Design a protein with these regions (language model features):
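Intrinsically disordered, low-complexity, charged terminal extensions of DNA damage-control enzymes
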Residues: 1-28, 34, 198-321
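Catalytic cores of DNA base-excision repair glycosylases
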Residues: 2-4, 8-11, 17-209, 213-226
Length: 321
């Protein structure tokens, strides 16, 4: 399916006006919208990747208090950045945020590039995030496409092909590019599109009778709102079992640093196997069971404790607490 821009050329102004009027009255009041500082916008967008808005609200303010500028973030130790990210999950985002801050300082003297291609060269910044920064911070007419706006646009043009990322979404990028205002207000338009998707054009039971774009929505007119967008089936949940060892010596507990390629790389955790440099003694005690999820994995972890007969010299990735 290709998007025919000529078909929509006469509707662009009407769609933009209707959406922006709704946004002025009904848009969400979010803390990162009180600024056009590209640093604040960038931090919020990275936090919002795969994390609910309400959760991000809890962390955004404290993160900016600790790292108020890109310079402060760039010079911080990675461990400190990860500590302030703790609880948001997907820690790779924090590492890439830190790396990008260093690059912005070293390559751009701390000033964010305004070109989307240059923005996409920074760690952790893809097409959507680059468009969000460019449009919201610099009011450049750059389109965005994320979960909420994708749903609005798919219903708007009755896009019934499977959405699996990449080239499959190009028609929706074309729609977004055709609609974003060229003469100012691009940031407000993009945020309005996201808010409409979050508040009105919901995945299930959307409030079509309250939607400012209902007169233009082909999915609504064809009675297919509930089945668009068409999303491929998600991966089935995989069940995993593991053991975590609480190794004790004279009141101290051993923790190990997660290695590259492991979940939570760089974070400290109880070992999942008994390290070969540890000599254990006495019985093994069962302390309980913890269940948690990582991506599409559901994990059951047995927590076991053992005493260490003597405390050996720790290796670089080990620590007694």
């Amino acid at each position: 399916l290709r998007f025919d821009s000529k078909q929509w050329s006469g509707r662009v102004d009407s769609i933009s006006r209707s959406l922006l009027q709704w946004y002025r009255n009904q848009g969400r009041d979010l803390p990162w919208r009180n600024s056009q500082d590209p640093y604040c916008i960038w931090v919020s967008e990275i936090m919002l990747q795969q994390t609910q808005v309400e959760r991000v609200k809890e962390y955004f303010h404290n993160f900016l208090l600790r790292f108020p500028t890109v310079f402060e973030l760039a010079k911080a130790e990675e461990a400190v950045v990860l500590k302030y990210w703790e609880g948001l999950g997907y820690y790779r985002r924090a590492r890439q945020l830190h790396l990008a801050a260093k690059k912005i300082v070293s390559d751009y003297d701390g000033k964010f590039p305004q070109d989307v291609r240059a923005l996409q060269q920074l760690p952790g910044i893809g097409r959507y995030t680059a468009g969000a920064i460019a449009s919201i911070a610099f009011d450049l007419p750059e389109p965005i496409l994320e979960a909420n706006s994708r749903r609005v646009l798919a219903r708007l043009i009755h896009f019934d092909s499977p959405l699996s990322g990449g080239k499959s979404e190009q028609p929706l990028w074309d729609v977004a590019a055709s609609l974003v205002p060229r003469d100012g207000g691009a940031g407000a338009f993009n945020q309005a599109l996201m808010d409409l998707g979050s508040l009105i054009c919901r995945p299930v039971s959307p409030f079509c009778n309250e939607c400012s774009l209902v007169d233009h929505c082909q999915a609504y007119q064809l009675g297919n709102v509930d089945r668009i967008p068409y999303m491929p089936k998600q991966k089935s949940t995989q069940k995993l079992e593991e053991k975590a060892y609480v190794l004790v010596h004279e009141g101290k507990l051993l923790v190990v640093r997660r290695q590259p390629g492991e979940w939570w790389e760089g974070l400290w955790d109880f070992p999942r196997t008994i390290p070969e440099n540890m000599a254990v003694r006495g019985p093994q005690r069962h302390q309980g069971v913890i269940s948690y999820s990582v991506t599409h994995h559901k994990i059951t972890c047995q927590v076991l404790s053992k005493m260490i007969s003597q405390r050996p010299a720790v290796r670089r990735h080990q620590r007694w607490l």
